[in-house]
């Protein structure tokens, strides 16, 4: 009899966990669709249980600058609107650079770029406690650094949106 009760309990517990996972997946899928609709100037993709957002290359930063260009700010405002609507998520912001400058300089600059993006999203009411920054320097290029176009593509920030498992 105990075995039947334990088995029934485990079955019910696994059903509850499945529903919770399904709810989280639905939440993330809904957010993904809204981001795709709101952000024409960004590449939005689902990677496992997260959403990755990369804005069009070459429009975010000048060489050696951590200040976002003005033309990207309306897109960040729309991005913030979706993030605010789906507030059960956390956002990892990674900054990147081209290979101009020393590795130490680039790591520091990439962290400043991530912080700059965080501050802009924060100015659009995205809660600061939902965002985390990381500077990658020149370590993860998306293009060759031997042309100005390639270097411009590498001067970027990327966003990884994760469901807050504490919810």
Per-segment meaning from a language model:
Residues 16-20:
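Bacterial signal peptide processing site
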Residues 31-45, 61-94, 122, 159-162, ...:
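Periplasmic peptidoglycan-binding/anchoring modules of Gram-negative envelope and division proteins
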Residues 66, 96-167:
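Periplasmic OmpA-like peptidoglycan-binding domain that tethers envelope proteins to the cell wall
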Residues 11-14:
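C-terminal motif of bacterial Sec signal peptides marking the signal peptidase cleavage site
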Residues 24-29:
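Pro/Ala/Gly-rich low-complexity, hydrophilic intrinsically disordered segments
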Residues 1-7:
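Sec-dependent signal peptide recognition
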Residues 39, 48-50, 56, 78, ...:
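Extracytoplasmic
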Residues 54-56, 91-96:
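Glycine- and acidic-rich phosphate- and metal-coordinating loops
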């Amino acid at each position: 009899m105990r075995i039947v009760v334990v088995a029934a309990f485990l079955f019910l517990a696994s059903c509850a966990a499945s529903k919770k996972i399904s709810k989280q997946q639905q939440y993330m899928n809904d957010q993904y669709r809204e981001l795709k609709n709101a952000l024409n100037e960004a590449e939005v993709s689902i990677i496992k249980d997260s959403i990755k957002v990369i804005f069009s290359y070459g429009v975010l930063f000048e060489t050696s600058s951590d200040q976002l260009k003005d033309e990207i700010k309306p897109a960040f405002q729309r991005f913030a609107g979706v993030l605010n609507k789906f507030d059960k998520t956390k956002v990892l912001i990674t900054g990147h650079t081209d290979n101009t400058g020393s590795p130490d300089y680039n790591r520091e600059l990439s962290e400043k770029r991530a912080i700059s993006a965080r501050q802009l999203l924060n100015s659009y009411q995205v809660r600061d406690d939902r965002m985390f920054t990381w500077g990658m320097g020149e370590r993860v290029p998306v293009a060759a650094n031997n042309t100005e176009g390639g270097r411009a593509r590498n001067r970027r920030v990327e966003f990884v949106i994760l469901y807050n498992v504490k919810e």
